[in-house]
Amino acid sequence: MDAVSDGRGAIAAAAMDQRGSLKKALAKAKGGDVSDAMMEEFKGAVTEVLTSHASAILLDPQWGLPASKKRAKDAGLLLAYEESGYDNNKPGRLPGLLPGWSVQRLKAEGANCIKILLYYTPFETREVNEQKHAFIERIGDECQANDIPFFLEPVGYDPTGGDEKGAEYAKIKPEVVKQSMAEFTQDRYGVDVMKVEVPINMKCVEGAKAFGGVRVYSRDEALDHFRAAAAVATKPFIYLSAGVSNAEFTESLELANESGVKFSGVLCGRATWKEGIPVYATQGIEAFRNWL
């Protein structure tokens, strides 16, 4: 854990393990196909520039291993173990592992920690969630057998197919985050650190800078949701940026601080670099480095 923390013991990590979503975004901005070399180059530039300001970088073994060699000497390495995305043809957003990889192999590539993203909601069917519970138990056992910390990233969703960025989902998001934290901080899962979403949608907080016009929570209610989710956790947790803008993520962290919750840091990805995608796609690597 020391390898991915700063001198205060806090985790201030950058995330660059996006795969399918990054490739689509680059292809859209470029107006054409994206090669493996471009994926590696983009990840390498982000790693090289941002790790001088971060305690660690989260990468994937598909396109991120060359980038891992470019990180700052004091920056730790987390490697993703899950397959990107999920199978739309099956219900429940069931998880899968990267073929050809194991915790032992990721550790041999220099990983200080293992990360798993899991789509999870307590409002899913019991049958689906039991499969997910067993899946995480197996990963926890594998990490413990290899003596490496396990970071779990539960990402909530609407099992009825609703928009997770909309106001209706914002009403249930606090409960999704809270129950996910209560479930997976149980010892049987072997999770060392939870990488969690903030338990609210900042665009729905009345009076917030990010407020989008539809009120779901007052400021005091939002603060209470932070406290309620943190209260059920029995393991350390950090907040993820979940693709929102840097300004919105910063405002959510200010709210977390105001609430008094004891979070252990952040893992910030797209909020930091996503606006540079068109720069890289249209102007090339040097322009992107300068933008970063």
Please name every model-derived segment:
Residues 1-9, 128-148, 158-292:
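Expand to "…catalyze enediolate/carbanion chemistry for C-C bond making/breaking, isomerization
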Residues 1-126, 190, 214-218, 235-236, ...:
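Alpha/beta catalytic barrel-like cores
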Residues 107-122, 145-164:
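A short mid-domain helix/strand-loop element embedded in enzyme catalytic domains
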